[in-house]
Amino acid sequence: LKISVTGSGDISGNNISCTDLDISIAGSGDINSSNITCNDLQVSVAGSGDMKLNNVTANFTRASVAGSGTAILSGSTQEAEYSVAGSGDLLASDFVAKKASASVAGSGDIKCHATDFLKVRTSGSGSVGYKGNPELDYPKKGLYKL
């Protein structure tokens, strides 16, 4: 299932259940959704748009923000890959992952929650904040405990 906003439109949807879900914003639009169940979740915000996904259950999640937009996730996933390029924010501290990787290029921020393992990479002034007590693979800068 693919849900996308291009430009300035807004989408709201609840109670989504599918195998693979691809949700994207390109531009200044907004997407709000609750109660999502899927195997593979792809989330992308490019531009200044905002995405809020509540009560998500997924096996694998890949979420990216490019530009000044914001993605907010809550719920749980087995494995997550997060990336921010630019000044955007990826807020997933209420999205519990067993294993996660987080990469920031620019001045953006990622907030995440990992229980078993967290790999962090930063370049620029961006940072990664985390909850949980995972094994860490991280550089000397840009990581802090929430």
Language-model features, listed with the residues they occupy:
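Extended, compositionally simple hydrophobic/Ser/Thr-rich segments
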Residues: L1-L146
